[in-house]
């Protein structure tokens, strides 16, 4: 069934507008907002679903509400951050007549402060995720620029051993310093596996169901 003429004309007008270069910066901001919202849902919804049903107590309704709230918060913040970042990038480029490396840092600095500056569980997870990747990237950049000498051996095994040694030491003796979701995961792995009563909570369930 063919679309009505009015709808076809509207779609043609919209597509013509989208192809005009003079509106590209503004349209990129809008699409960035869209992509941020979609990516936030893709990343947070599965994570919240798994973590909530594994570690959170409460009714099914409470669990679903927690999943929806976490997904909405992540999606909204990421969408607004992309919108803010691309808007500030475009503004700086327009004012200074070109792009500079510092523009990216300043735009993201302001956007990060505004959208991810609140100290909560979701922002903490996002920032820690980025911290590890930024440190890796800076080390690689340092090697590329010659500030850090390139090693003749692969440091990855040593790095892995140190990280795993530290995280288990922190979990066993300084647990409050670890992020809550990491504490929950490690408790499930290393402490809950020390307790069982019969076959049901040895192989089938993690913990025995309360008797009625």
Swiss-Prot record:
Transmembrane segments: 97-117, 151-171
Chain positions carrying an annotated carbohydrate: 206
Annotated Pfam families: Tim17
GO terms, biological process: ether lipid metabolic process
Topology class, membrane: Multi-pass membrane protein
Keyword annotations from UniProtKB, A to Z: Glycoprotein, Membrane, Peroxisome, Transmembrane, Transmembrane helix
Cellular localization per UniProt: Peroxisome membrane
Primary localization: membrane
GO cellular component: peroxisomal membrane
Tissue: Liver.
Oligomeric and partner information: Interacts with PEX19.
PANTHER family: PEROXISOMAL MEMBRANE PROTEIN 4
Family, similarity comment: Belongs to the peroxisomal membrane protein PXMP2/4 family.
Protein name as catalogued: Peroxisomal membrane protein 4
Species name: Rattus norvegicus
Name of the gene: Pxmp4
């Amino acid at each position: 069934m063919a679309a009505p003429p009015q709808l076809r004309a509207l779609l043609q007008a919209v597509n013509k507008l989208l192809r005009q270069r003079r509106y590209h910066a503004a349209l990129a901001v809008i699409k960035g907002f869209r992509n941020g919202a979609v990516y936030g849902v893709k990343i947070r919804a599965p994570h919240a679903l798994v973590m909530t049903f594994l570690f959170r107590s409460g009714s099914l309704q409470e669990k679903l509400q927690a999943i929806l709230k976490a997904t909405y918060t992540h999606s909204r913040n990421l969408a607004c951050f992309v919108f803010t970042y691309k808007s500030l990038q475009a503004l700086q480029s327009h004012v200074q007549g070109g792009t500079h490396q510092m523009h990216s840092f300043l735009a993201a600095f302001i956007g990060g402060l505004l959208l991810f500056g609140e100290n909560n569980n979701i922002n903490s997870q996002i920032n820690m995720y980025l911290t590890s990747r930024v440190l890796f990237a800076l080390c690689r950049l340092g090697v590329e620029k010659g500030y850090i000498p390139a090693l003749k051996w692969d440091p990855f095994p040593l790095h892995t051993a140190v990280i795993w040694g530290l995280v288990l030491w922190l979990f066993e003796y300084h647990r409050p310093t670890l992020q809550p979701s990491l504490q929950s995961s490690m408790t499930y792995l290393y402490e809950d596996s020390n307790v069982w009563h019969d076959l049901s909570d040895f192989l089938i369930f993690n913990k025995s169901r309360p008797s009625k």
